[in-house]
Amino acid sequence: CHDRCCRFLTAASSLIYDTYRIAVECTDPEKIARYARRLAAKEFRATDVDHGTEAVRFLSTITPQGLITYTDSVKTMCDRIYLIDDEWGAASRLLLHALRSSALSAKLDIISCYCPLSPYEKLEHLMIPTIGMAFITTNRYTNVELEPYRRIHAKRFTDMTKLKIRKQRISFNRKAAREMLDEAIRLLVEAKNIHDDIERYYISSMDYAKVNTKVEETLSKIKSITEKGG
């Protein structure tokens, strides 16, 4: 189940990335850069520390329950939430990377949240708890339910006439990606059911005291390595 699930997720990621490649050709990067500079100048108050730090996290995930974005952390740490409505993935990515750079230049601590389908390159959400601000991408995949402080529409940075020429291909990508994700989720459900069935047999034989001891030993080793800088 796991290997098949990964293959379906890879296929979905490829289709979504193809839509991004189409959309980025219809997106005005200079307009996004100007908007990001204005927004940063208004909102990002520089601190007196030497430099800002960046933590990398996942806020969204694919689970047996479907696609989930964990918004409790956002609501706890940030009271001003900018929602970026973007169904194509180009404008939001460019905007978030520009805001990330500006926030770090202002020596602010940030939390960068990447897309689980493209974890090394697609910045999906950005949180800046020190100023109570978050920038959250919304689309048919993220399933975000948050009350926005402001809403930013990707259309304002997009040549919609040019984008409509590729409407058929985008529609195909969208439907096919949805089917790939649905199948991946179905396989996750199947894998969990198999795990639960197996667990019924071995759980009563588990020595949890030994498990906890091994966990503590492993954590101690990790801590020792990190303290030595190795």
Task: List each model region and its residues.
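Extended, charged coiled-coil helical stalks used as long, distance-spanning scaffolds
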Residues: 175-182, 186-192, 196
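Conserved nucleotide-sensing/catalytic segment adjacent to the nucleotide-binding pocket
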Residues: 1, 101-182
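Charged, amphipathic alpha-helical linker segments immediately N-terminal to NTP-binding catalytic cores
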Residues: 1-61, 162-164, 182, 197, ...
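Glycine-rich phosphate-binding P-loop
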Residues: 68-71, 77-103
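A contiguous, basic/glycine-rich beta-loop/short-helix subdomain that forms a polymer-engagement track
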Residues: 58-73
